[in-house]
Amino acid sequence: MNKIFTDQGFKDFLYWQYQDKKTFKKILDLLKDIDRNGYKCKGKPEPLKGELSGWWSVRIDEKNRLVFRIENEIIEILKCDTH
C-alpha cells in the first residue's frame, strides 16, 4: 500500500528520525505491519471516536501513538506522537 502523511504526521515522523532512532525504527516496523495486516496489526490497534472517528491508533510506546487510516489501499498517517 502507498503511504501519505498529513503535514503534522510528517513533522512527527521527521522528529523521531532525528531525535530517537529506536522510536523511529518502531514506527517503521508498525508501518510495515499495517501494510501487511491492515487494522489487525501489532500495537493494540483501536478505532478512535469523536472527531477522529474513522482513524485508528496503535501504540508506538507507552506514551506515543501512531494515528492512521486506510482508504483505497492508501495508508494515511495523521500523527505519530502523544495520543
Spans of model-derived segments:
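PIN-domain endoribonuclease scaffold, especially VapC-family toxins
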Residues: 24-32
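A short, surface-exposed loop/turn module that caps and links secondary-structure elements
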Residues: 33-58
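Alpha-helix boundary/capping residues
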Residues: 16, 31-34
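A short alpha-helix capping/helix-coil boundary motif
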Residues: 9-10, 44
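Enriched for short, Lys/Arg-rich terminal
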Residues: 2-4, 11-25, 56-65, 69-83
